[in-house]
């Protein structure tokens, strides 16, 4: 489905259009490819999106030695990587399902590597590869499933951290609450901050 001309004129319509992909990964990726060039302007200027900066500050507080390897999962155009880089983090890897979004991320010049991968599927990293995983704005309706957390745990070193944002409604209704409880019960991870 192509973005119609009217969609290009309204930021709100672009967001609705992307979110209406019906959970189809291929369609979602195509829609993000088409939105990539306008994404930063839409999100920052129209919606006042500040989560990348806020989460990056939290990451810096929990991982104060900047010589750590971080995965930006669902990196999009690289807003989180840009914020982490501004705080001194240099070993950053980005993954996203949209090549168009990854191209925008590459243009920011803050990632060591950018790779096309789909959250919820096996990730092409060795076990215990990263000191931390950061996932901002990706756990939302029709995007990455709760099962993504299993791979985050697998690729994070023991004692590492997984930082993610999620809206309460998605947490309650899309399997994340149950997944988190199961991971805590099986001692695979421990929640340290809300």
Where are the predicted features?
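A short acidic, Gly/Pro-enriched loop at the edge of an enzyme's catalytic core
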Residues: 122-133
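Conserved beta-strand signature within the Rossmann-like core of class I S-adenosyl-L-methionine
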Residues: 159-167
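Class I SAM-dependent methyltransferase SAM/SAH-binding core
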Residues: 71-122
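A short glycine-rich, Lys/Arg-flanked "PGG" loop and its adjoining helix->strand segment in the class I
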Residues: 146-158
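Conserved Class I S-adenosyl-L-methionine
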Residues: 174-194
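A short beta-strand submotif of the Rossmann-like class I SAM-dependent methyltransferase core
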Residues: 135-138
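N-terminal auxiliary segments of SAM/dcSAM-dependent transferases
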Residues: 1-26
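Conserved alpha-helix/loop element of class I SAM-dependent methyltransferases that forms part
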Residues: 48-68
């Amino acid at each position: 489905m192509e973005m119609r001309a009217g969609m290009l004129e309204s930021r709100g319509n672009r967001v609705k259009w992307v979110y209406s992909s019906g959970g189809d990964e291929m369609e979602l990726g195509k829609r993000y490819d088409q939105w990539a060039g306008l994404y930063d302007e839409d999100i920052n200027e129209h919606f006042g999106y500040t989560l990348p900066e806020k989460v990056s500050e939290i990451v810096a507080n929990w991982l104060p030695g900047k010589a750590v390897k971080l995965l930006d999962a669902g990196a999009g155009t690289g807003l989180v990587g840009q914020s982490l880089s501004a705080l001194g983090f240099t070993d950053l890897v980005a993954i996203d399902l949209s090549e168009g979004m990854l191209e925008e991320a590459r243009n920011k010049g803050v990632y060591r590597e950018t790779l096309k991968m789909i959250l919820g599927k096996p990730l092409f990293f060795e076990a215990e590869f990263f000191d931390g995983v950061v996932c901002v704005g990706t756990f939302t309706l029709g995007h990455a499933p709760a099962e993504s957390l299993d791979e985050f745990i697998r690729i994070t070193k023991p004692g590492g951290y997984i930082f993610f944002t999620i809206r309460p409604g998605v947490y309650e209704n899309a399997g994340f609450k149950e997944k988190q409880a199961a991971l805590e019960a099986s001692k695979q991870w421990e929640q340290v901050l809300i």
